[in-house]
């Protein structure tokens, strides 16, 4: 579960700049991009389930995507498009901590290779490569991985200026029904403050101090459900 240490982490680093990048006038601080977590080289046994994880801290909000041997396998280069439209012309923080997880449900020889995690805040990119080798006795993999949804991406922490709109995001690798809670409150599309998208995004308009806190995104299918947590921290304009 994300604790208040995450707030300190983002606030202390939000003023650091990305090398050789000019400030964005709309941002309330210098651009930032850094890894918070990188995947390790791994030896995996045939038939084993494994997960590679990667994390980023950044402003503007970073996206994370994965490549295997130079081919895109998961993720997107752009994120937060709707939030950017709603906040057009405003000063923004647009700072976040983001996590991404790439899952292999049953390892085979084709899963061996160089996995590259790429983080991108729209101004610069950073890359990290982890080499995975699949070996041992070969085994047959089931055709279907019937289970609760796997949440492959979360915005773990968001920092945004009060009165702006903010997007809290979760993603799943499979078709999923999404719901969002703040504490015990189930959030619904009310046409004014909250808007939820099939992709897993929750948009909150005109945020205020009362919106600060933990939000739970829940992915659900016929086999079960999985929940992830994000934290929203509204700030004052500088």
From Swiss-Prot:
Compartment(s) of residence: Secreted
SS bond list:
54-117, 170-217
- In what tissue types does this protein appear? Expressed in PVT neurons and weakly in some head neurons.
The record's principal subcellular location, in a coarse class, is: secreted
- The reply to whether Disulfide bond figures as a keyword in the UniProt entry is yes
Question: GO cellular component terms?
Answer: extracellular region
Q: Which Pfam family, an example, fits this chain?
A: I-set
- List the PROSITE patterns: IG_LIKE
Q: Which GO terms describe its biological process?
A: cell development
State the superkingdom: Eukaryota
Q: What does this protein do?
A: Probably not involved in maintaining the position of ASI and ASH head neuron cell bodies and ventral nerve cord axons of PVQ, PVP, RMEV, AVK and HSN neurons.
- Recorded protein name is Zwei Ig domain protein zig-2
Q: What is the lineage of its organism?
A: Eukaryota, Metazoa, Ecdysozoa, Nematoda, Chromadorea
Its encoding gene is what? zig-2
């Amino acid at each position: 579960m994300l604790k208040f240490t995450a707030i300190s982490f983002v606030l202390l680093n939000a003023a650091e700049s990305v090398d050789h990048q000019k400030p964005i006038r709309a941002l309330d601080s210098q651009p930032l991009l850094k890894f918070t977590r990188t995947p390790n080289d791994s030896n995996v046994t045939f038939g084993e389930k494994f997960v590679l994880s990667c994390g980023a801290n950044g402003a503007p909000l970073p996206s994370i995507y994965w490549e295997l041997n130079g081919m895109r396998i998961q993720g997107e280069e752009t994120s937060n498009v709707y939030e950017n439209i709603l906040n057009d012309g405003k000063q923004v923080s647009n700072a976040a901590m983001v996590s991404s997880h790439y899952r292999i449900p049953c390892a085979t020889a084709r899963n061996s290779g160089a996995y590259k995690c790429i983080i991108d805040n729209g101004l610069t990119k950073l890359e990290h490569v982890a080499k995975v080798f699949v070996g041992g006795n070969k085994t047959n993999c089931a055709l279907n991985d019937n289970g609760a949804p796997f949440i492959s991406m979360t915005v773990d922490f968001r920092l945004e200026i009060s009165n702006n709109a903010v997007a809290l995001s979760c993603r799943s690798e499979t078709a999923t029904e999404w719901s969002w809670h703040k504490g015990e409150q189930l959030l619904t599309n009310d046409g004014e403050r909250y808007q939820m998208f099939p992709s897993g995004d929750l948009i909150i308009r005109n945020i205020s101090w009362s919106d600060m806190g933990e939000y739970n995104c829940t992915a659900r299918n016929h086999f079960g459900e999985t929940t992830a947590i994000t934290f929203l921290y509204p700030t004052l304009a500088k």
